[in-house]
């Protein structure tokens, strides 16, 4: 009896020691190995290109024409070695008879629960010496820390995405704030239960009326003018509106002509406190061109734009076009002067003024009568009114 072979070449699995791929996620990991073991079958598959001709040469003679069609009829067994389609017949043929199989409810429920799960054969080697199952793409966009789609100045970016990016940039500040909050909370818990009278005796501070903390603002990276501006806005909110209160309770009597119907309070103002939600802290600097640095060229462009805008501004009142210091034309002309001018024009018209006319066949008496008629018409019309 011969010795048993240590390795059966027919059933053995061959591996090759190769360098780890650059697309492997563990390529830059110091703890990972530089070389990995890859099966010879996978190397052969990746080395040669699969096309229709090679597939026909390898599997064309062994594959049946109806192989794999049994799954369309509910037969999920492996039909590579046995043809299950030979037992099926089309309904309606002479040599076929329909026999309904008795199916119980339990078997139907089991069939619904059964699902096909394809699992790869587990490897006999540890995962540390094998390449990663997922490989990364080595394209330009995939190697960037921030993709071009969300990088740069984008005023139309989704505000929710902008808020997340801002929080990621200031992650250190948030960590410090949370640590300070935890310390204050621990001190508050250690102090014990508070007295109700002391709690209600504290001054009530509405949302947005906290005392301004310059240290926290400086830690957030704000400039001096931003800090001063926020302090000014906070003090402006705290001051009561004296003008509005005096106007509502004025003791001066008003006439009925000045009575006006007051405006109704809109529902949006009354519900502003109830609808208030967590929002991002908006800065006092806008993202428009007015917040950018203005050099001489941009300043000149702004002046030209303002001038063009004034030309296209609609005139609300036509009286603005009239100069109040300018005298009216009708005030400069007297009625007697106007009548003298008209008489002189009618008498001298024809031979000396205007275009040349054909010689008039009207006698002097008729001309005098026509002038007299014109004078009569004037007298009947009365004095000219302008």
Swiss-Prot record:
It is found in: Nucleus; Cytoplasm. It comes from the Eukaryota. InterPro entries: Ltv1 (IPR007307). It holds the Pfam family LTV. Keywords: Cytoplasm, Nucleus, Phosphoprotein, Protein transport, Transport. The modification Phosphoserine is found at residues 171, 179, 244-245, 286. Residues 103-126, 198-219, 236-287, 353-374 are annotated as: Disordered. One of its GO terms (biological process) is protein transport. The keyword Phosphoprotein applies. The keyword Heme does not apply. GO terms for cellular component: cytosol; nucleus; preribosome, small subunit precursor. Residues 248-262 have a biased composition (Acidic residues). Residues 270-279, 354-368 have a biased composition (Basic residues). Involved in protein transport. Non-ribosomal factor required for efficient nuclear export of the ribosomal 40S subunit. May participate in intracellular sorting of GAP1 out of the endosome. Belongs to the LTV1 family. This is Protein LTV1. It comes from Schizosaccharomyces pombe (strain 972 / ATCC 24843) (Fission yeast).
């Amino acid at each position: 009896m011969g010795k048993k072979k240590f390795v059966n070449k027919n059933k053995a699995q061959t591996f090759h020691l190769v360098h780890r791929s650059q697309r492997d996620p563990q390529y830059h990991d110091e703890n990972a190995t530089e070389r990995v073991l890859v099966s010879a079958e996978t190397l052969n598959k990746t080395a040669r290109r699969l096309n229709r001709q090679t597939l026909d040469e390898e599997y064309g003679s062994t594959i049946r024409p109806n192989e794999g069609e049994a799954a369309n009829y509910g037969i999920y067994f492996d039909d590579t070695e046995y043809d299950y389609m030979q037992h099926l017949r089309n309904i309606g043929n002479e040599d076929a008879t329909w026999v309904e199989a008795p199916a119980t409810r339990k078997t139907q429920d089991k069939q619904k629960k059964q699902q096909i799960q394809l699992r790869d054969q587990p490897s006999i080697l540890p995962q540390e010496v094998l390449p990663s199952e997922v490989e990364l793409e080595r394209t330009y966009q995939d190697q960037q820390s921030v993709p071009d789609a969300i990088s740069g100045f984008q005023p139309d970016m989704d505000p929710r995405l902008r808020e997340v990016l801002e929080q990621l940039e200031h992650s250190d500040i948030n960590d410090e704030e949370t640590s300070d909050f935890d310390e204050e909370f621990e001190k508050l818990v250690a102090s014990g239960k508070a007295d109700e009278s002391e709690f209600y005796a504290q001054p009530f501070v509405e949302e947005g009326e906290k005392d301004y903390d310059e240290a926290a603002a400086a830690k957030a990276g704000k400039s001096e003018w931003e800090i001063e501006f926020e302090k000014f806005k906070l003090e402006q909110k705290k001051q009561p509106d004296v003008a509005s209160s005096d106007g509502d309770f004025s003791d001066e009597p008003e006439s009925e002509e000045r009575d006006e119907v007051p405006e109704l309070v809109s529902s949006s103002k009354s519900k502003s406190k109830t609808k208030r939600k967590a929002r991002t802290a908006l800065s006092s600097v806008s993202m428009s061109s007015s917040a950018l640095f203005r050099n001489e060229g941009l300043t000149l462009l702004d002046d030209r734009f303002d001038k063009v805008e004034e030309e296209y501004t609609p005139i609300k009142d036509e009286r603005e076009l009239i100069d109040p210091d300018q005298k009216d034309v009708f005030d400069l002309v007297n009625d007697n002067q106007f009548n003298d001018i008209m008489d002189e024009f009618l008498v001298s018209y024809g031979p000396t003024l205007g275009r040349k006319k054909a010689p008039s066949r009207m006698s002097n008496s008729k001309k005098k009568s026509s002038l007299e008629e014109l004078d009569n018409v004037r007298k009947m019309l009365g004095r000219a009114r302008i």
